[in-house]
């Protein structure tokens, strides 16, 4: 276990999951191609950029998998109840979850790439309406945003 500083001055706990990752059946759920996302956004006039707060940590780990995340440190032995950083399938799991949350809004008013959400509209009013839809969905699904990184 190592603790490393984040850009915002807070700390990130990093666990070495290399052995677990070797034994894990890989989830090949695709991440979106950034050029396809950019094509969708081309020509739009108004944008809001949202950032999921501690993205992976908002996804519950399956109860049967929590014990696999166990680690020991000077203060005891712990296991994650949420998806920790460092698991090989974390990006695919998170992307699948977020796409599920916004499935009816994607390509209509929001594009999602991991924990970065781009809300858009052709007019200021439409962009505000779309932002409201996305924020309501975040509230309904308890998806927290990092207010420091939202624009």
Where are these regions (language model features)?
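Retroelement reverse transcriptase polymerase core
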Residues: 1-151
